[in-house]
Amino acid sequence: MKWFIASDIHGSEYYCKKMINSFESEKADKILFLGDILYHGPRNDLPKDYNPKAVIILLNELKDKILCVRGNCDTDVDQMVLEFPILADYCIITDKDKVIYATHGHNYNENNLPPLQKEIFCCTGTLIYLPATYTKITHI
């Protein structure tokens, strides 16, 4: 199975469409979305083409292809309008001989690694790495 990994579109219709176009051109099977879907948060400026209602429509059309974890800007209110689960803090994916721990990165990240076995890949909104060696990798 081919996974397309994305995160942090923060309600931007522009970046959501770019993500979907890339997902389709890569011919990936599933999107692993690492949070921060609709809201930009109080610390951030509005993203380009901020339109969370359009993002809701675009992503709900792909609901059967999305596996999502909660980002630090995602809330129960967001879950009310999205037709796929978004509120898990992490997920564990088994794909062939690989085990992947996926999270947004606000709880576990490069400086605060989750307690994982050495053969498990850890994927956050900004990094993919193998905790046993602390080596950053760009693909799985």
PLM features: residue spans?
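Structural motif
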Residues: 5, 32, 102-104, 123
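Core catalytic region of metal-dependent phosphoesterases/phosphodiesterases
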Residues: 2-95
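Conserved beta-sheet core of the metallophosphoesterase superfamily
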Residues: 99, 106-140
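Hydrophobic transmembrane alpha-helix bundles
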Residues: 67-77, 103-116
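Beta-strand-turn-beta hairpins that frame and shape the catalytic cleft
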Residues: 1-3, 92-101, 135-139
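Short acidic/glycine-rich loop or secondary-structure boundary segments that cap or lie
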Residues: 40-43, 76-79, 101, 110-112, ...
